[in-house]
Amino acid sequence: MKNYKFTISFVGTNYSGWQYQPNVPTIQNEVEEKLYYIVNKKKPIKQKIRAIGCSRTDKGVHAIEFVFNVKMEFDKDLNFLRKALNSALPKDIKIHNIEEVPLEFNSRFDALKKTYIYKLFFDEKNSPFFQDRAMLVYKPTDLGKMMEISHLFLGYKDFRGFTKELEDENGYCSVENITFKVDYPLVEISITANRFLRYMVRRMVGTMLSYAQGLISIDDVNDFLKAKRVSNHTAKAHGLYLKKVYY
């Protein structure tokens, strides 16, 4: 038995996230199904395939770099496996690299930090080109205000105010940096942290956006950051990309 690390990218538009769900298309469903067929072909005893993903992604979220690992027996060239998988998988999922790693490697728990990017497209003409690749923004927005409050999210803080609901679980995350890449009308916000809670990036971006549109005050933002209440200002899933996983 060996452990293999897979590095992939995908367009999440047609999938209900990474994690397996019965009767709905997910990235995990696709890679496990195709991998099972390839590694067990012409073998009398079939081995079970279980892919451990580096992160759960929501429906519609994309990945520039996503990592999963699989423990299995495989006696052929890994480049052959990569090519075979890419031939079998849908065109919106791409395998970039496969490598053998130590048996104890776990793509989820061994990740030191991750970088997500969020794409905003400030669109007054309803462009069709970014419909599923960025959040289209129609309301007047002060981009300077978004940048101005982004520093409030930096550091080691309790981010339960930016997740699904206030819970007793550990909500502390260390946000290392937040940067803006402006190529108007497209704006990319990059956020790096040691860990992320569910909806955290989307609600951080949605909160910054609402503040920049005058919908909420700085006091509201501070309340969310103190976990006094949960922000319901959630940016669309299809603007979010997992960019990099660090080990």
UniProtKB/Swiss-Prot annotation:
Matches recorded under InterPro entries: PsdUridine_synth_cat_dom_sf, PsdUridine_synth_TruA, PsdUridine_synth_TruA_a/b_dom, PsdUridine_synth_TruA_C, TruA/RsuA/RluB/E/F_N
Binding of substrate, residues: 116
A GO BP entry: tRNA pseudouridine synthesis
Known EC number: 5.4.99.12
Key word tRNA processing present: yes
SUPFAM superfamilies in the cross-refs: Pseudouridine synthase (SSF55120)
GO MF term list: RNA binding; tRNA pseudouridine(38-40) synthase activity
Keyword line: Isomerase, tRNA processing
Annotated function: Formation of pseudouridine at positions 38, 39 and 40 in the anticodon stem and loop of transfer RNAs.
NCBIfam families, per database record: hisT_truA
Family (UniProt): Belongs to the tRNA pseudouridine synthase TruA family.
Subunit structure and binding partners: Homodimer.
Protein known as: tRNA pseudouridine synthase A
Organism, scientific name: Hydrogenobaculum sp. (strain Y04AAS1)
Classification lineage: Bacteria, Pseudomonadati, Aquificota, Aquificia, Aquificales
